[in-house]
From Swiss-Prot:
Keyword field: Cell membrane, Membrane, Transmembrane, Transmembrane helix
Membrane topology: Multi-pass membrane protein
Domain of life of the source: Bacteria
Localization in the cell: Cell membrane
Organism of provenance: Bacteroides thetaiotaomicron (strain ATCC 29148 / DSM 2079 / JCM 5827 / CCUG 10774 / NCTC 10582 / VPI-5482 / E50)
Chief location of this protein within or outside the cell: membrane
Record protein name field: UPF0324 membrane protein BT_1919
Upper classification of the organism: Bacteria, Pseudomonadati, Bacteroidota, Bacteroidia, Bacteroidales
Transmembrane portions of the chain: 2-19, 23-45, 85-107, 117-134, 147-169, 210-232, 253-275, 310-332
Keyword presence, Transmembrane: yes
GO cellular component terms given for this protein: plasma membrane
Family that this chain belongs to: Belongs to the UPF0324 family.
């Protein structure tokens, strides 16, 4: 198993190095995104030459290390951040997350697409991109290629928004105040990295509020995973009643750990440098998980998924950009 873990760690080191390149930084591709790309390149070139004894190590990275990474992600948040941003941003976040996930599941049914991919794509679009998809993947036990397909859609449309929002704001197409633009950016962009990139391009006043609003969405991962677990358990119970084989339910204890870490971090007991070091370690662990998932994803599996995941992601993207804009513009004035 050790060989597989070391292989993924090596790829993750490469992802960190590439992520520091000026071009990669300019498009705000996090090491996690670079990692899954490297993993997919490996899957479609040298994967067949991998010794079978290395596979358990790769699976360990995509499951166990993933959960540790999600728990440590809590060191990026405090409950004080949530209180500072106020009721309007929290309400907008709740609406965005609820409509995106529920709407995505419904659209997935209309498109007659794979339920797992529809759920992962919806959660990724609604909450925090790749990290949310990884958390949900661990809960519903989706196949690695489904996770990779969902992550790909999030990366594509999130990257488009990262360049689109600053362009629209600078050229006067967004009739929003700086506070509203911060809420709009944080509530509708997919990845944390996308929010950071877009916020920096529009100024510190927007960037700071956008990041906090985004982090509130990240915190919503916990209730979403718990609700998902409950619904999956109910669905599998019905399958057993119909005579089908029982499938074990994965209780997302790591989500509880994530919230516990947020609570601990809210007391500000650790030095800032130590927290920064933990966050760097956490990014590396999540990069290992993403890379491991990428190594299980071949082009053939993308072909198997078809165009429907991208159609769903596009529809959700239109909702986030257009629906999110009108929510922020017309709802926040009544709440502030």
């Amino acid at each position: 198993m050790l060989h597989g873990v070391l292989l993924i760690a090596l790829f993750s080191c490469a992802a960190f190095y590439i992520g520091e390149m000026s071009f990669v930084r300019s498009i705000s591709f996090s090491p996690m995104i670079v990692g899954i790309i490297l993993g997919m390149l490996y899957a479609n070139s040298l994967r067949n030459h991998l010794p079978e004894t290395w596979v358990p190590g790769i699976q360990f990275c995509s499951k166990k290390i993933l959960r540790i990474g999600i728990i440590l992600y809590g060191f990026r948040l405090t409950f004080q951040d949530v209180m500072a941003i106020g009721l309007p941003a929290m309400l907008i976040d709740v609406i965005i997350v609820a409509v995106t996930i529920c709407g995505g599941i419904y659209l997935g049914k209309l498109l007659k697409m794979d339920r797992g991919i529809a759920l992962l794509t919806s959660i990724g679009s609604g909450i925090c991109g790749a990290a949310a998809i990884l958390g949900a993947e661990s809960t519903i036990k989706a196949k690695p290629y489904k996770t990779a397909v969902s992550v790909s859609t999030v990366v594509i449309f999130g990257t488009i928004s990262m360049f689109l929002y600053p362009f629209l704001y600078r050229n006067g197409f967004c009739a929003l105040t700086p506070d509203q633009m911060g809420i709009y950016t944080g509530a509708t962009l997919h990845e944390v990295a996308h929010v950071v990139g877009a916020g920096d391009a529009m100024g510190n006043g927007i960037s700071d509020s956008a990041i906090i609003v985004k982090m509130i969405r990240v915190m919503m991962l916990v209730p979403v995973l718990l609700i998902t677990t409950y619904l999956v358990a109910r669905a599998r119970k019905r399958q057993v009643q119909k005579g089908q084989k029982f499938q074990k339910i994965a209780v997302p204890w790591f989500a509880i750990g994530f919230m516990g870490v947020i609570a601990f971090n809210s007391f500000d007991l650790l030095p800032a440098q130590l927290v920064a070091g933990i966050n760097t370690l956490d990014t590396f662990l999540l990069t290992m998980a993403m890379t491991a998932l990428g190594t299980e994803t071949s082009i053939d599996k993308f072909r198997k998924a078809g165009a429907k995941p991208f159609v769903l992601a596009l529809l959700l993207y239109v909702w986030l950009v257009v629906g999110g804009y009108f929510l922020v513009k017309y709802l926040t004035p009544y709440l502030m």
